[in-house]
Amino acid sequence: MGTPVEVSKLHFLLFPFMAHGHMIPTLDMAKLFATKGAKSTILTTPLNAKLFFEKPIKSFNQDNPGLEDITIQILNFPCTELGLPDGCENTDFIFSTPDLNVGDLSQKFLLAMKYFEEPLEELLVTMRPDCLVGNMFFPWSTKVAEKFGVPRLVFHGTGYFSLCASHCIRLPKNVATSSEPFVIPDLPGDILITEEQVMETEEESVMGRFMKAIRDSERDSFGVLVNSFYELEQAYSDYFKSFVAKRAWHIGPLSLGNRKFEEKAERGKKASIDEHECLKWLDSKKCDSVIYMAFGTMSSFKNEQLIEIAAGLDMSGHDFVWVVNRKGSQVEKEDWLPEGFEEKTKGKGLIIRGWAPQVLILEHKAIGGFLTHCGWNSLLEGVAAGLPMVTWPVGAEQFYNEKLVTQVLKTGVSVGVKKMMQVVGDFISREKVEGAVREVMVGEERRKRAKELAEMAKNAVKEGGSSDLEVDRLMEELTLVKLQKEKV
């Protein structure tokens, strides 16, 4: 099914939340819409434009002269006037700066997004887009868009499973302790979880009211865009459209839209390691022999835990690539590595301090497993690369994502984390790290399932695939809305 001629006239205004996990797939989405003949404009702040968008957008536009240019619209964000530290334009600032109260500042940062309401109104008047893709953390954007007759699509940055799980979750009254597993009610699959793994907010708290506003704005919106593909979460896609949002389109995996080496290398921030050197190191390794380990941008472990991870990796006997994010003043210190560790594992291990070219690494034939914090972008990149996973969730919806991998897809092994890091956090011993790494690297049935899912992911985004057709359907619906408005 092809897209109608009128689709080329569509103009998408994309407004991502100012965090890696939201900005990166938003850029991928803009590229996707461009390949379908639409124009895309990304709204962001000066710092984020420079860090995340300017270079890859310039490259994309130059490489695709036949497509509508992706453009950037800058919105100023007066941090200090809003009670935030100077330069606090994304969550990376919050999680990488020492001596900050992460919890308080994160909440203040979220609530400060309301500042953009008035500038967005002005832009909708002057730009007259055909659709606003507003991040979930901008609940006020539904009413703003409605005021000007613009359909607002919600983007969460996660998959159907976690969206359904968070909709269904009700903490049971009959469990003895917060660590006792219970089945999530009404959710297909009899999924087990514990109270310690669920992020709950008091209804009358500031965050409780904010989350209610998110749910209400989603209900009143035009629909939801989901970075996933039907074959991955079939039962949960059906459930979501039947009981949660009614209207949703799966358009992923968005990361697979990046086909050129440079696109993959430039995805996100500039890598802290030369990607060619990294791949050269991997080229010297046997197929499926290396475990890749990364915990995302918002996780930072204490030294004691990092020492256990290092020891567990060493004990496993497997070669590894380990991405380590250190916070603030920790960056210069190397007391988190066991004495002589790097010398002992020289040739067997590669430690990347900072940002890694993750998609390039995951796709390399030498990588045989992925130890992940279960952030949705990382998890989906692992699925697209056909990798079995060791799951180490930290917070947010990551425990739900872990259940999808371990209980539904059966392509992962849990390292044994029992509770959220935001609360207290678990301490995982070197023996658990060793055991999980060994198990995931040798399980052939698990690996076979993972490779089958990767093939499904690639087929989903090909012409005529499930996600490709879904994008066409979305375009056609928005085109009809546009044509009806023009008749009035």
Swiss-Prot record:
Keyword Metal-binding: no
CDD domains: GT1_Gtf-like
Keywords tagged on the record: Glycosyltransferase, Transferase
Any Pfam family the entry gives: UDPGT
Known EC number: 2.4.1.-
Induction pattern: Not induced by pathogen or salicylic acid.
Transcription regulation as UniProt keyword: no
Record: residues binding UDP-alpha-D-glucose: 297, 356-358, 373-381, 395-398
Organism domain of life: Eukaryota
GO molecular function annotations of the record: quercetin 3-O-glucosyltransferase activity; quercetin 7-O-glucosyltransferase activity
Role: Possesses low quercetin 3-O-glucosyltransferase and 7-O-glucosyltransferase activities in vitro.
UniProt similarity note: Belongs to the UDP-glycosyltransferase family.
The protein, known as: UDP-glycosyltransferase 73B1
